[in-house]
Amino acid sequence: MEYKYTTTFQAPLISCEISEASLISKASLENLAPLVPDNIDYDENVDLMGVAFNAAVINQFNKNGDGMDTSTAIKYTDKFIHKPTNIEHDKQKIVGHIVSAGYSKFGSSELMGEEEVRAIKEPFNISLGAVLYKTINPNFTNLIKNSLDSESDKYQKVSASWEVGFNSYVLAVGSDKLSEARIISDPEEIAKLQGNLRSYGG
């Protein structure tokens, strides 16, 4: 399906090793642990690596000036499951797949249920669990491991990002947080102001 517009959400993949084959967010080891696939015997499946990470901040603008609200996040989060993970958005460089998706608190990464999220207007995270294929691209999995080593020049250099396509949008004016911004949905007013958007050179 073709979309008129695309944007990318990005979050640092700050991880630590919880077993020889599993990685999870360093800042919140216990909080994101339930997202790491636990129905896989990593000792038997030595070619797999389990990973958990925050994928995007909701209700806050990304570096492109784009943002996603709570209702949109809820609508699309489950659609991450079973999607492939790749390198640099190259669909020919698949290195794993998403196996779980959820939400976590911004800052602490404490997991939240969908009902709790529905009432939130402040920033929170979409959090994902994935399985990576070690043998498909050993250089990539080694890069992940090196990103955990504080003495490596690759330390904390890995980030997770995902591209979103959409055909329409509204404007949020006045704040970097959606909850504090004025929402403009009138097509004529959007047309007048869209030149100020980064995607239009503003």
Which residues are covered by each model-predicted region?
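Signature of dsDNA virion morphogenesis modules
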Residues: 1-202
